[in-house]
Amino acid sequence: MAKQIKAQGLFLGTLLLLISNIIVKGLGFFYRVALVRLLGAEGIGLVEMVSPLFSFLIVLAGCGVQPALSQLIAGRGEAERQLYFRAAFFILLLGGSLVTLAALAFSPLLLRHFISDSRAALCFHTILPAIPIISIASAWRGCFQGMRRVSALGVSQNAEQAVRVAVGLWLTARLLAAGLETAVAAASVATVCGELAGLLCLVWQMRHSGIRPLATSHTAGELLPAVRRLLAYGLPMTAGRLIASAILMLQAFLIPYCLSRAGWDTRAVTEIYGRFSGVALSLLHLPGVFTAALTVSVLPAVAESMQDISSGRMLLQKRIHDSLQAAMVFTLPGMLLLWLYSDPLCTVLFDNAPAAIILRWLAPGGIFFYLQVTLASVLQGLGAVRTLLLNSILSGIILLFGIFWLTSQPTLGILGTALALDISWLTGFLLHLNACRRLTQIRLNWRDIAGKPLLATGVSLFIYHLAQPLLVQSILSPAAARLALCCLICGTYLLTLLISGGLHRLHR
């Protein structure tokens, strides 16, 4: 490539993506709140029924090339980067085009078997053009990630989200009068526009940096070995992601089916599913702003440490330790606040009080969800894609069995789904942790990773229960009292971490 780009370190890269993800998550959360208020729980339920099938098609089109490209170009020279990028670009262009055409051709079959409400058909058809756009963009994302230029990823995410939110809100508001199905399709159109904006932003940044990854031509003899290496790494990864996406797709079909078995009608089922996926899970994913940034930086960092024979083991241990500790430090207070403030969050933001109890059941398991995501990135960096595949299969089977058994119980309903997710996340975390220990033979300091954050969480909860009666009975309004308690929890948590030394190792 034309210029030598300086890589950004693990902590710096995470910090840059953290800032970007705060903006992206903030915009996305605002967008979700507005959509729920515009479309209602029933409308957002239709959107969420399409999302797992769309995600499955995206993974199928991507062939696992983005993480493969990221790992293969990490620490390599410019000539090899150009070669792998060009090979990845053509794989993704072909994959995205073929999957989109196949989805259009077989859409009646897909809708009949994987989406329980026929009103979501228009939403599904209008989102399909995003598939080739996302596929092509993943080549640039994998290249930037492998070079550890994560700031470029952050800029493109911001552009993508800003366009999606602006187009989505404007178009949904204008199409509400045309009916719920048409208004729901506006969210799909907004997704297509946002992904296109993100792709254009990535291309512009690459050209602005003086990099021309497609400028140098390569012969078929040069490209074929690169294609084979990309697919050799990416296809097992695709299998794992396809299984994860297939599980989400089956989950989106199985939950409404089990709720129907438990006695709810079609409209009630769609509304309940909207509360679960559109409200409760949206809030649960909000604290993931940090872990999302962390996982993007961890994969190439772990891959690079594996290449350094002399100091690789110590560096690998430190990076795995730091990533787990950082995930724990940021996840615990987030889950605590969601558990304590589920009622006001669901009522004030979404005007959907019934979703609060679902969120309370999901919050404890959310801790293991975020740790599982972090460990999955570590395993990707180690190249243990087959292990990830087996772990995904096992935890997915447990999830689907739990949903089928628990959600069908009239006394549990959608709460059974939440419990099944908690069990599945715990299982996935334990499987990933065991795999990391087995593959790396390193020892982790769980006193720093979990002990100190748990201590800080316990102290914060104790202070909360002491202060709550005093603040509630004071002259403060209920909203002001809740805000004061929230600040008190965060302040106590941070202070306890500082005193116990729970933050001193997070310096990179």
Question: What is the meaning of each model-derived region?
Answer:
Residues 96-242, 246:
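Hydrophobic transmembrane helix module of multi-pass membrane transport proteins
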Residues 62-77, 284-314, 320-324:
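Helix-loop junctions and terminal segments of transmembrane helices
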Residues 134-156, 364-394:
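Membrane-interface junctions at transmembrane-helix termini in multi-pass inner-membrane proteins
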Residues 89-113, 170, 317-368, 400-401:
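Alpha-helical transmembrane segments of multi-pass membrane transport and lipid-handling proteins
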Residues 151-152, 162-201, 205, 386, ...:
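Membrane-interface helix-loop junctions in multi-pass transport and translocation proteins
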Residues 116-139, 336, 340, 351-375, ...:
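Alpha-helical transmembrane segments of multi-pass membrane proteins
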